[in-house]
Amino acid sequence: MYQVDFNHPIHVYFIGIGGISMSGLAEILLSEGFTVSGSDWNRSALTEHLEKSGAHVNYGKPQKAENITDDIDLVVYTAAVHADNQEFSRAKELQLPMLSRAEFLGQLMKNYDTPIAVSGTHGKTTTTSMISEILLQANTDPTLSIGGILKSIHGNIRVGHSGLFVAEACEYTNSFLSFFPKIGIILNIEEDHLDFFKDLADIRASFRKFAQLLPADGTLFINGDIENWQEITEGLACRVVTFGTTSASDYYPSDISYNKTADATFTVHSLNGQTRQLTLGVHGEHNISNALAAVALSDLLSIDYRDTAEALLNFHGTDRRFEYKGTINGITIVDDYAHHPTEIAATLHAALNYPHKTLWCIFQPHTYTRTKAFLPQFAKSLALADKVILADIYAARETDTLGISSADLQALVQKEGKECFYFHTFEEIEDFVLKNCINGDLLITMGAGDVVNIGENLLSR
């Protein structure tokens, strides 16, 4: 495998430079004096920022072979790039060194004394952001690579000068097995990405391999609510610390209460028997576990708890995580990235504690594979809303070979006893909302695709 010498800048080309992680890696290289170029289908705020910082970006679909020139020293590509991609094929033809995004990020981690990798089926971006805010509050000068936009740094990347490096670690295509963490976090393990993994056992095996990456002087924080979590940690040389919802874990909460906007206050019970109070600035019960992971890590790093508590109180989430978008005709519009049944349920449970008359959920299913695999679970989770509106399935990297559509999900939601409407276009959905939602209603757009545009379109009308 090609080894990058980060002390000697070269020309790196990113296929898919506009992705949230790829754009962050590109920005790190620009800050270190590298020549950066790349391609993406469409112009975005992320690519425009890179261009202003000195990168050259080629736009268009398909990405063209002539973009790959022999002055490029290294090509970095995402998991979404297939062998028939013209740029990918041309780089192979020219025998240019090539690394996947995960391989490149793994090599970057090696340059830091304390690389921290945050993994789990759900909650990675929120927890990575919580940790980031704590490290910033404590003036530790960390380098951060986040899967969402963190408002306090006006982006998803921060280049620091200490030995701390924090990054999300995604299990899809076993990407996180290319990393070199000293500290690892496993937030949860559930079925997902079944276009790659065979089943839950296959996913658990991948997380076990991730845990085995940690060195003997490292630490793994794992959610003690994960069923048979000991199977993941058995035989590890590193230290293992648990967090969870019950006293069986090393870190756990008690005396939980919520304010009128569903933010939690609770007592944190710690490994050493210490108890401390914590109030979160984000909504929902699921964020208690995320916060406990962040607190446990902060204790390991000997961060003053006053900094930890202040950072978590002032953290109000990243973009697309229960993000307040605005109000139109007295209708509150919130957007959320949830695209898995567990995430949907967590978001809607949080919304139920938020002031509202009728809770509307506009859901855009993400990928045919996931929709087919979790169809009954999606219906049960969506039925937590008072009324549901469905958009067409967002294909992402897939083509429809499964014969599945949002109409199948609509039928199951209706069987759960809830009104469910299905429209093929965003314009139809927007018109329906304006005719049927009333003052005091709460409207959540939900999904990992472009469903966020519905709320933004409504607010601009």
Q: Language-model segments: which ranges?
A:
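C-terminal helical cap/extension that packs against the catalytic core
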Residues: 379-439
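Nucleotide phosphate-binding/pyrophosphate-handling subdomain across enzymes
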Residues: 2-13, 21, 25-32, 112, ...
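Phosphate-binding loop of NTP-binding sites
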Residues: 5, 28-34, 51, 65-68, ...
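Short acidic/histidine-rich motifs immediately flanking catalytic phosphotransfer sites
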Residues: 69-74, 163, 439-441
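Beta-strand->loop->alpha-helix junctions that form or flank phosphate-binding loops
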Residues: 39, 58-62, 99-106, 145-148, ...
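Conserved N-terminal Rossmann-fold NAD(P)-binding element of oxidoreductases
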Residues: 12-17, 446
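NAD(P)-binding Rossmann-fold cofactor-contacting core
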Residues: 35-49
